[in-house]
Amino acid sequence: MITIISPAKSLDFDSSIADIRSTEPSFQDESYRLIKKLRTLSKKKVRSMMNLSKDLTELNVLRYQEWEPEFTLEVSRPAILTFNGEVYRGIDAKNLSESELHFAQDHLRILSGLHGVLRPLDRIRPYRLEMGVTLPIQRKRNLYQFWSQKVTKLLADELEASESKTLINLASSEYFKAVDFTKLPGKVITPIFKDFKNGEYKVIMTWAKNARGRMAGYILRNGITNPENIKLFDEYKFSEPQSSEEEWVFLRG
């Protein structure tokens, strides 16, 4: 069983982290091609393309200039301990044990606009490049076309080697669109999280993001390899009547 999640815009390169054996990203050549393309863009283009403030534009243009495919301890950190958005607050990776982090390394994948796919302990340098950005490169119209074949093949190979051949999709729709799920072996299950508000159950985006992270953390802390066991996630209640084979609905409230 493989679980996929999205990255985060916010990065933490300042807090202290435990010393753990780390790895390097799988698609460094492809990432460097993207960086070199980004270096050719004007600040005005970067700002409009990514909808950034002036300060964030300056920061990320500098990041592109400084970025190199070198992942030393001085300039990079493990991805799961660096991304810092709502999903990652849900995972609470800094409080995972060493054995839980090693389980994550084998069973969790992070989709990325710059790196394609990251293992949790792959070291990353500061960057910002969302999968939905329209960045034409190498006859590809956008990052979906650039990454889809590589990302899909990597996930397909890992699923083929897994016991349950099941992908748990906890990524956002922006990132999951990079995966051609028709070419994956086995099942793809997308958990949907709904909270009770104003008399009905509905997806509330911030809470749903956090819930995706909490479910990912639940999978890692319990060493789950059988998808049926995620139905026992104790922060939401699995709803059999509202679920289908591909979408599992979880309710709270």
Question: What function would you assign to each model-found segment?
Answer:
Residues 1-2, 183:
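C-terminal accessory regions
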Residues 2-6, 166-169:
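Short hydrophobic beta-strand segments
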Residues 4-95:
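Active-site helix-to-loop segments that bind/position phosphate- or nucleotide-bearing substrates
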Residues 93-253:
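Internal, well-folded beta-alpha domain core
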